[in-house]
Amino acid sequence: MSRPIFEEPPDDMPDRAGALIINWAGEAGMSAPEVRDAFQTAAERLVDAAIGRREHWEALYPILFCYRHALEVALKAALPATTHGHSLPDLWDNLRPGLIGRVPPDQITWLGDRIAEFVHVDPRSTAFRYHDAVPSGRDTELWVDFHHVKATMARLLLVLAQIARDQR
């Protein structure tokens, strides 16, 4: 097992199933929308697998981490490239003023409410990554309906993608 995990691309790469190439070529690698889509796709596939295998609790943290990260990247994609950090409230606070007058008020409220839900359960972007990062004061039990979270996140990320496209 001494073979490296990250290798030069093989000549027969198109024939290998599941192969991935990371091609930075001196650039960032993937655009923010591509990263957002990759994490959304990963979350959706995990949701589908969890539902199909009835492995709900085992898949919960990876699913929510992927969705939370897709949300963060979606917010960043709609903001100037100089905006950094992992704080959803800060990212939302930077984006929201520019939406007023361009996006229906009820949609702005809906976006803010969904973002606030993630902030409530994962204020430091760590709750779904580490076993010991549960924020104090969090509800002891919360229910996540996988069908609902998949549909809601698809809508949320679509709206943010449209906002990002309109910003350009």
Predicted features along the sequence, with ranges:
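Domain-scale activation on soluble regions of proteins
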Residues: 1-168
